[in-house]
Amino acid sequence: MGVTKKPDLNDPVLRAKLAKGMGHNYYGEPAWPNDLLYIFPVVILGTIACNVGLAVLEPSMIGEPADPFATPLEILPEWYFFPVFQILRTVPNKLLGVFLMVSVPAGLLTVPFLENVNKFQNPFRRPVATTVFLIGTAVALWLGIGATLPIDKSLTLGLF
């Protein structure tokens, strides 16, 4: 690798070029109109064309047709609602279950105020936020896995 020579800012030729705008931000091409008028619409229309083309060439059904007269024994929500479903399923009082669901985001909103003194971004130097994250992740996984099991094994996951 060669040694680069630093520019001499006292050089009158360089100063004249910099005054005309021929300095470090002169090279390249401008975003307007090249990118915004020509490249972005091509990418967006190309993406739409690919989606429409795949939908026309391979029209696949989403799931099986619904039969309103044959319902399953237990209806499960989508996977991302499993922890919430498990809370509502295991708590006997439904109002308490709704209160527990509302308390989760409310508790998460208090974490920045608990650690507002700590200015570090490293999670190992923010023990409260790291502990809340790890415990919350473990509880969410526990509740999510338990929601797929029968109600008698849901809290213990069939382990105990």
UniProtKB/Swiss-Prot annotation:
Q: Which domain of life is it from?
A: Eukaryota
Subcellular localization(s) per the UniProt record: Plastid, Chloroplast thylakoid membrane
Q: Which residues cross the membrane?
A: 36-56, 95-115, 131-151
Keywords assigned? Chloroplast, Electron transport, Membrane, Photosynthesis, Plastid, Thylakoid, Transmembrane, Transmembrane helix, Transport
Asked whether the UniProt record includes Glycoprotein among its keywords, one would answer no
| Molecular function as annotated in GO | electron transporter, transferring electrons within cytochrome b6/f complex of photosystem II activity; electron transporter, transferring electrons within the cyclic electron transport pathway of photosynthesis activity; oxidoreductase activity
- Entry annotated with the keyword Transmembrane helix: yes
> Which cellular components does GO assign to this protein?
chloroplast thylakoid membrane
**Membrane topology per the record?**
Multi-pass membrane protein
Quote the InterPro entries the UniProt record gives: Cyt_b/b6_C (IPR005798), Cyt_b/b6_C_sf (IPR036150), Cyt_b6/f_cplx_suIV (IPR005870), Cytochrome_b_C_euk/bac (IPR048260)
User: Which GO annotations describe the biological process of this protein?
Assistant: photosynthetic electron transport chain
NCBIfam families on file = cytb6_f_IV (TIGR01156)
Q: What does this protein do?
A: Component of the cytochrome b6-f complex, which mediates electron transfer between photosystem II (PSII) and photosystem I (PSI), cyclic electron flow around PSI, and state transitions.
* Assembly and binders: The 4 large subunits of the cytochrome b6-f complex are cytochrome b6, subunit IV (17 kDa polypeptide, petD), cytochrome f and the Rieske protein, while the 4 small subunits are petG, petL, petM and petN. The complex functions as a dimer.
Recorded family membership: Belongs to the cytochrome b family. PetD subfamily.
PANTHER family reported for this sequence: CYTOCHROME B
**Protein name as it appears in the record:** Cytochrome b6-f complex subunit 4
Please give the organism. Answer: Gossypium barbadense (Sea Island cotton)
